[in-house]
Amino acid sequence: MAKEQELNLQGGCQQQAAQPQAPAVVASQATEQAVIQIKNGLPEQLRPLQQCFIKPLETAKKMGIPNERYVQECNFAMQAMLKNTYLIGCAKKYPDEFVSALNNVLLTGMTLNPTLNVAYLVPYKGVVQMQTSYMGKKSYAINTGLCKDIDCSLVFKGEEFAISKGTNPSIKHIPNPWASHTADTLLGGYYVITYSSGKIAFDTMSKEEIEAIKKRSPSVGSGKQSPWDTDYFEMCKKTLINRAYKQLPKIGMSPEAQKALEIINGLDEQVAKDNNYGQNEQDDVFVDVTEV
């Protein structure tokens, strides 16, 4: 009898024990929590864009990206837009494109973290777009296995520099850290790619070539301050890495990686195309793109 009561007691405890929630329920609750966090974090100026910030949660879910990471990216985006209120107007006018820009951050594995400076939200032709920096492109190429290493360097007056081509090509650069490093003393730059096979490729660009691309930049053409004024050497390096990207192997890439690469190169390629046809919008003076 006592044994029967003990069994009944155990059975009752099992019935009362909480059943684990299904994964779908847990995921739904996590998404709801992320939505609440996004809504609560929106400043007054960005509340009309609430749904734009929420929609990319679906992309995060499909890619297996934690909601916490996307909420963090939303916070970075909000900071950028409050700092540059022109972006807010562009996002309100073209909300779908703004959603695409946020999605592109996730699809490429980039971050809008301002301390890392790998990707930004920029206006181009009145539309908010994601753009990668020199460091962003460098990190992507290495992290995705497009190459083992990729780097760009600038050469200044007073430094030893020589290249040799033929059957055994090589490049020699002895920097002078105490030389004058200014736009006036810049001679040019070069990139070096180390492929997965160990093979090395390199090429150079003169200052004149870099300056020719700078002059075609829409931000420079506006006559107002541009990244070429505030971050000249960074822009020179981005010009070089855009050229280097043409030499990266694309065969064997997964469809997802190909899509991400298209996104990363997309804005730079569009601006280069528009530069050639004179179709730049002069109102968008914050774009820091260079020709590929």
Model regions and ranges:
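Glycine- and charge-rich intrinsically disordered segments
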Residues: 1-59, 64, 255-292
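Binding-interface segments
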Residues: 35-252
